[in-house]
Amino acid sequence: MRFEPFLNQEEIRQLQEFEKNGSKAQKRTPEQIEAIYTNGQNILVSASAGSGKTFVMVERIIDKVLRGISIENMFISTFTVKAANELKERLEKKLREGILMTDDPEMKAYLNDQMQAIALADIGTMDAFTQKLLNEHGYLLGIPPKFRIMQDKSEQELLKNEIYKSLFENYMASDHSQVFLRLVKNFSGNRKDSKSFRDQVYKIYQFSQSTENPKQWLENNFLLAANQYQDYDDLPDETIDALLQSMKETAISLRDLTDLEEYGQMTKAGKPTAKYVKHLTMIEALNDWSMHFDSYYGKSQIGKLAQDLSALLPSGTDVTVAGQKYPIFKDIQSKISQFRHLATLLTYQPETLPLLLELQSFVIDFTEAYLEAKKSENAFEFTDITHFAIEILQNEEAIRKVYQSKYHEVMVDEYQDNNHMQECLLELLSNGHNRFMVGDIKQSIYRFRQADPQIFNQKFKDYQENPENGKLILLKENFRSQSEVIDATNAVFSHLMDEAVGDILYDDNHYLKAGSDKQKIRYPENNCQVLIYDTDQKDNGEDEHDKEDERRTEGQETLSPGEVNILVKEIIRLHQEEAVPFSDITLLVSSRTRNDLLFKTFNQYDIPLVSDGGQENYLKSVEVMVMLDTLRSINNPLNDYALVALMRSPMFAFNEDQLARIALQDSQEGKVEHFYEKVLNSLSHQGQHAELITQELHDQLELFDQSLNAWRDYSRTHSLYELIWKIYNDRFYFDFVGLSPKAEQAQANLYALALRANQFEKTTFKGLTRFISMIDNILNTENDLADVDLAKPKEAVNVMTIHKSKGLEFKYVFILNCDKKFSMADIHSPLILSRQKGVGIKFLADVKKELNATQLPSVKLYLETLPYQINKKELKIATLSEQMRLLYVAMTRAEKKLYLIGKGSQEKLSQKFDTKREGQHLPKALRESITNFQDWLLAIHQVFDSKDLSFTIDFVTDNELGPESIGSISHQSNIMIDDLRDNRQSDSIARAIDMLNNVNQLNQKYEAAINLPTVRTPSQLKKFYQPIMDIDGVEILADKSQTPTTFELPQFSKAKQVTSSQVGSALHELMQRIKITSHVTEKDIQQASQLVDAEAEVMAKIDLHKVKSFFEATELGRLIQVHHDKLYREAPFAMLKTDPQSQEKFVIRGIVDGFLLLEDKIILFDYKTDHYKTPLEMKLKYQEQMALYAESLRKAYDISTIESYLILMGKERIEIVECS
């Protein structure tokens, strides 16, 4: 078979011309064609939002396949597993289309082979690849192939804490313990523990792990800044230049201010005013000192310049003219503060070096000890696996050359989110001229994962300036958004983003351009809107915005009712007037927390709202916290916090007044007693203030105490699972949370708590005390458990974080809480790290001598060392740049219309920013000083001509947000004609049938529980195990007498129908009879269907195309075909188990539908034909059964890795659910 060669540049140019003049409705852009067909060199594709980068990657891969490059000879890295699966699906679809289009048998066979190879090709995350590499070559480092990944943060934290504690004790007992103690106190301050120091150690460790060689970075880079910045001459030139530039700009701003007509330069007598003379002196000095800095001061006298400036300028930042404040001195004052105490800093800085050396030593020792502990467990973090892979590729030249010769091309998606560790790995896999990198620096928003956008930026500049090093291709056409969204985005970022703040200059190389004529059609009603809730309130003489500023200062940044009402009003208008489906609307928020008001208000207005779910907030959900405090109280009633929380909860609803009355019931004056003891005193009327306990309160306490004691007694003889459900049922708590705004999620959380308690007791750990201890350990390490996933209604408004929305698109987008301050906590951290400069710390200095405070034993003061200040400046710019990119990602999600919503005082915000600009950008100092999205937008709107901005700003008052203004949702009846079609009986008969059907369904659903024998021998299965074992596909060998629990319903003239169970049984048999080969055909399925023992009416109900799609469209189906020689079906098993309570043995027997026996793992699968609502429901129903199957196979074959899957066949299409 002959393959076509790759296109040269002239052929690519001709193809671009042909495409341009062609008649296709959707044409590829010249840049897309160039990115698809260019070959033989490194390529960086800068793909703006919505520019079709995934399309380009798929087309490029397919083109290479058609030119004879096997898909197994490409390394294709994606950012997420989901992205990898989507890419595989697209490739498979294109290959299938290719098979149908060609008549060449050889080409058909080749493309079919390529389709089969997708499952085995290196298409996935870098983590997946490094695990594969380590499985093959880990022996070179002494790593056994059966290692596991420590994905649970709680497990990581527990092991880290154990290593830290041991190492800490060793250092405290060492001969350098005094230096170490000073180091710990430097970070712990007045705290009586070392938690603050431990946090900094973990922070350094985490940061170092993102480098290609953590130990090397700690040894060579960690102390670079500390060693470098020891004197005035060591100060970075850019720091001095920033001060001098600020002096010049301050002089210009002050001159412009004095030239205002309302300034008043002269008195009535015609003489200059004192203020004018003073300001002229400042202007002259600022210009003179900045111009002659080297001759007047120089670096060695920078501290004196700062003192002179402090004497020259006012201490405040504003100049008031005609009642208007102008922040003329704001920027220069912030710059001066860095140098004012420079001499003092340089005096004390040498004292930090011994502490930093000790810190360096401790972190290196911790890193090594932690790695050794993980090796002993044969369990590693993802970063460990990558470092091992890098070490193997660096040290083993033969292995490195195998990979470099194997891969025709090394492709990576989302390149802007790479860290230096990943970049090193890609370089090792590449031969130096076969890299293909796709990304967009404007969408780099994962700095918290140590992603470094400068990796992308350096490549961008290098290829732009040196084309011989690689080709730069720009994809600027946006195929997602209408012009109104594109224009607003360009307007914002052309004035906001440059290399100084934002990492790149947002110029013609990065402007978004509409990719189709349809997008260029103008819809003025869809212009971008910034809607700000006006917080100006004159009631009580207090400004609501001032109170809001206070709340923000305290970190309580929640959505206000006004903002939510603006949102609701517009959503109702869109839905009612423009018939916009709720599912076309998405709300973007900065974090998952503090959004309860959204759900509450939407619930009030009958607007369906679903969340993206999120992760690791489970233990902090209110309903779970209530239950955990209940369990803590049962375990130990003397736990005051838990007991009061339980009493205050909806289960017992004691109010604050009642709790205060109980708190006064000490048995003796001056005696300290627990709250539960005071409860008992209240019940026995033995308290000091018994008269405060009313009869109503006494009755309420009696009910509480009875319930608590009943639960305590029950907990001693029953499982945790049973105890939790007893609490739910006794106090109707499960039903109560069903009335909350997030009822479905809340009930799922409570249900999951019972399941997790059940799973916990299957381990070697048992009992309430240990369960509570485990939960508290997780919370103490500031970790959590994953949230429970729910099937979400399709027709609902979506709310998700901006990070979660990346890569997605929505018709209408609302960006909420735009006035929320950026998180700057890292900038005020005791320690700041830089990859290039190393560490900078705040130093706890004793300035007693400096202040001549001889009468005091010591005067401790935190000083920001020079390395700290330099790193702080770098970190602040990096944080602001990432916030700009976050706003870019949020704005570019919208297809039709974009809204941004915030709040603030119209009076204060309308004239907050002056009209000063730097070319087409807001002044750098202004951009650095702004701390929220809203102020960036306001500043742009006030500085630049609003006609050219493509977005409007409107303040909305309470008068516009009344109930009548907001409106309401009108609902249509949910009753469909089809529901009434066969209703030919009287209402009474219909009701009777419904009742009998319901009874029968309940009998069938709870058949196992009803049929439990009332009298059992010790050898029979204990009740505790019944919910686990007595499930579909698992038979318990125990004699039991049983009474039938089903009865036949009278037919009431119903026509005979094929039951779903008959269809399910036939479908199940069909799947077992299909002959599995490397390629299951439709003919194979037809032949198998003829062997099924079922009536023709039943077989007519089976969709054979659904069965075929399982083998063609699902990864599991393809895997079964690829490994058909390792497939086992209808495999019986028997397993002996011991009941831990009675020590009696019992046998479990069952039949496994099928499994693949591979060298390193077993892939177990089971067909389920039940009707179901959500895959999660089926997973919860059958996960225990699958766990038993897995345990049996694990013991039989001595293979620890078992992947379990349910093949759900109860709907129109087959779904695969992992149960591992």
Curated annotation (Swiss-Prot):
Q: Write the Enzyme Commission number(s) for this entry.
A: 3.1.-.-, 5.6.2.4
Repeat among keywords: no
Q: Quick one: a GO cellular component term?
A: cytosol
Q: Does the keyword Acetylation apply?
A: no
Q: Which CDD domains match?
A: DEXQc_UvrD (cd17932)
Name the needed cofactors.
Mg(2+)
Please give the residue ranges the record annotates as the region Disordered.
533-559
For this chain, one GO molecular function annotation is:
3'-5' exonuclease activity
Domain named UvrD-like helicase ATP-binding: residues: 26-482
Concerning InterPro entries, the annotation shows: AddA, DNA_helicase_UvrD-like_C, DNA_helicase_UvrD/REP, P-loop_NTPase, PDDEXK-like_dom_sf, PDDEXK_AddAB-type, Restrct_endonuc-II-like, UvrD-like_ATP-bd
Signal peptide span: none
Gene Ontology terms: biological process: double-strand break repair via homologous recombination
Residue span(s) of domain UvrD-like helicase C-terminal: 519-807
List the catalytic activities from the record: Couples ATP hydrolysis with the unwinding of duplex DNA by translocating in the 3'-5' direction; ATP + H2O = ADP + phosphate + H(+)
Protein residues bound to ATP: 47-54
Q: Which family does it belong to?
A: Belongs to the helicase family. AddA subfamily.
Q: What function does this protein fulfil?
A: The heterodimer acts as both an ATP-dependent DNA helicase and an ATP-dependent, dual-direction single-stranded exonuclease. Recognizes the chi site generating a DNA molecule suitable for the initiation of homologous recombination. The AddA nuclease domain is required for chi fragment generation; this subunit has the helicase and 3' -> 5' nuclease activities.
Give the matching HAMAP family: AddA
Q: Describe its assembly.
A: Heterodimer of AddA and AddB/RexB.
NCBIfam families with a match to the protein in the record: addA_Gpos
Q: What is this protein called?
A: ATP-dependent helicase/nuclease subunit A
Q: Give the organism the record lists.
A: Streptococcus uberis (strain ATCC BAA-854 / 0140J)
Please name the taxonomic classification of the source: Bacteria, Bacillati, Bacillota, Bacilli, Lactobacillales
Which gene codes for it?
Answer: addA
